[in-house]
Amino acid sequence: MRILLSNDDGVHSPGLVALYEGLKGLGELKVVAPDRDHSGASNALTLNRPLTVEQHPNGFRSVDGTPTDCVHLAVNGLFDTAFDRVVSGINTHANLGDDIIYSGTVAAATEGRHLGLPAIAVSLVNNGHFHYDTAARVVRLLLEYKQALKLGPRSILNVNVPDLPWERLSGFRVTRLGHRERAEGAVPMTCPRGKQRYWIGAAGQGGDAGPGTDFHAVREGYVSITPVHIDMTRHEALSGLREWVDGMDESTGGQP
């Protein structure tokens, strides 16, 4: 099994190193990750300049681009043989609910899916202890058993692991994405030259965080596993919207 590892925290992230160490012996591992932190980059793809790839003494490769760039280059240009899996992480913080829209960690997995590969995005629900070894062990277990899991080649699993020793985990839960409340306001500041600057405000708390959600699972000490797909169509709105458009056509005689 050939596994591509990437992330959004950068090629020197301790989470990425822990993931690599934890998956040794499971297959052929290749690491292609951003040369710096790209948290919150989402699915950004660099189209306005060429990208540079550098190989480090430990064999890891870095790209001066986004997580999506890294997976795209790795699958479509850097290596002669194909990959079987993409694993993105271990992210330093949780990717729960609406976080996945912004997450570069999930975006790297998403790019794998776009290129026809099953993918896992794994994040540590960090409380300051940094039990990356626990998260790496979770990923190894999932990869070992994923052969029997019939999700298809374009599947994505979003995995969030409580920041606990392995023996203190409550178990595993299959969950749906919860939802956060509105984000906190932007934080203004004045730079030394007197110009106004702003920091993006903190993410909102889990508003939809009850039983069955990823928020609830990790709060109870469970590993949260959420199957994610890319279709953003709001299917339940299609019928009503068609009726509205049909009525609009009738009132305008079919003219815009």
Curated annotation (Swiss-Prot):
Task: Provide this UniProt record's keywords sorted from A to Z.
Answer: Cytoplasm, Hydrolase, Metal-binding, Nucleotide-binding
- Gene3D superfamilies on file: Survival protein SurE-like phosphatase/nucleotidase (3.40.1210.10)
A Pfam match is SurE
Q: InterPro entries, from UniProt? A: SurE (IPR030048), SurE-like_Pase/nucleotidase (IPR002828), SurE-like_sf (IPR036523)
Return the broad EC class.
hydrolase
Q: What does the entry comment about cofactor binding?
A: Binds 1 divalent metal cation per subunit.
Q: Family per UniProt?
A: Belongs to the SurE nucleotidase family.
The function of this protein is: Nucleotidase that shows phosphatase activity on nucleoside 5'-monophosphates.
Which named protein is this? 5'-nucleotidase SurE
Q: Which gene encodes it?
A: surE
